[in-house]
Design a protein with these regions (language model features):
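Beta-strand-turn-beta hairpins that frame and shape the catalytic cleft
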Residues: 2-9, 21-27, 117-126, 157-163
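Active-site-proximal loop/helix segments of hydrolase catalytic cores
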Residues: 138-202
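Pre-active-site segment of Zn-dependent metallo-hydrolases
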Residues: 3, 17-62, 66, 71-75, ...
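Active-site neighborhood of phospho(di)ester-bond hydrolases with catalytic His/Asp-centered motifs
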Residues: 29-31, 57-67, 85-88, 164-167, ...
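Active-site environment of divalent metal-dependent phosphoester hydrolases
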Residues: 15, 35-36, 66-72, 91-95, ...
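Active-site HxH/HxHxD metal-binding segment of metal-dependent hydrolases
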Residues: 47-118, 123-134
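Binuclear metal-ion centers of metallo-dependent hydrolases, dominated by the metallo-beta-lactamase
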Residues: 102-119, 176, 199, 203-246
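Zn-dependent metallo-beta-lactamase
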Residues: 1-28, 32-37, 42, 203, ...
């Protein structure tokens, strides 16, 4: 499903993949993994269907961290002259999956650090903190699953709208300081903020629209999206679910 918001067309394509179109400019966030863009994802949950996606139309592709680095998916969404924005800490050499190196990606690769800004064809890109707190629920063996510095979130300024994808992160104090038009929170049951934290943040940010992503792709990401939508709507914040019915 494509959601029309202001001058944007927004589609959740599964897992953390989002396509954002404004006029002749197309951006993708964290494309791929788990068969969502190869047609191999065949889950029965409330989630976009897996498709053999090969548009190669993206002007901008943004990757938050190693867990969302999928070189095949980047090639499927990026045009030949795309700008591929990779967070500095992304390192294919330490990824225990079959991925190509950065030198084999299409287009121009730009490495971007924490709290940095970049502009591609008039679209502003800002990195934001994204991590799990050591004393929070998303730890393994006493260590955060996503330690500070491992990944980032992105705030895109596109067509006058400010689109916020927090990445794989708990709700952080820095998030509450943002001016956001379109909020794309994870609402999964592990690894990131859950639906309750995401709803609290949505109420505080008071965006024009909330579209949750990064849930129901596999068992550990299961979430009650209908309950999230009811919670957010009950707080007076517009929300849309971009998913196939279970």
């Amino acid at each position: 499903m494509t959601i029309r918001y202001d001058d944007l067309s927004v589609s959740w394509l599964g897992y953390a993949t989002v396509r954002i179109e404004h006029e002749d400019f197309i951006a993708y966030l964290d494309p791929g993994r788990y068969g969502t863009l190869t047609g191999d994802w065949d889950g029965e949950t409330a989630h976009p269907p897996g498709t053999d996606y090969d548009a190669r139309d993206g002007d901008l592709v943004c990757i938050t961290h190693d867990h969302h680095y999928d070189s095949d998916a980047i090639a499927r969404v990026a045009s030949d002259d795309a700008t591929i924005v990779l967070y500095d800490a992304v390192d294919p050499a330490r990824i225990d999956r079959d991925v190509d190196g950065i030198e084999d990606l299409p287009g121009e690769v730009v490495r971007i650090g924490a709290h940095e800004e970049y502009v591609v064809e008039g679209v502003g890109i800002e990195t934001l903190p994204a991590y799990n707190r050591p004393d929070g629920p998303n730890t393994s063996g006493g260590e955060p699953i996503h330690p500070e510095g491992f990944g980032c979130g992105y705030l895109l300024d596109i067509g006058g709208s400010r689109v916020f994808w927090p990445g794989d992160s708990d709700v952080l104090d820095a998030h509450y300081e943002l001016a956001v038009s379109l909020f794309l929170p994870s609402i999964s049951s592990s690894f990131t903020m859950d639906r309750h934290g995401a709803a609290d943040l949505a109420e505080s940010l008071d965006p024009d629209l909330v579209v949750p992503i990064h849930y129901n792709t596999f068992e550990a990401l299961e979430a009650d999206s209908a309950a999230f939508a009811a919670d957010v709507a009950g707080r007076g914040v517009p929300v849309i679910l971009d998913e196939r019915s279970s």
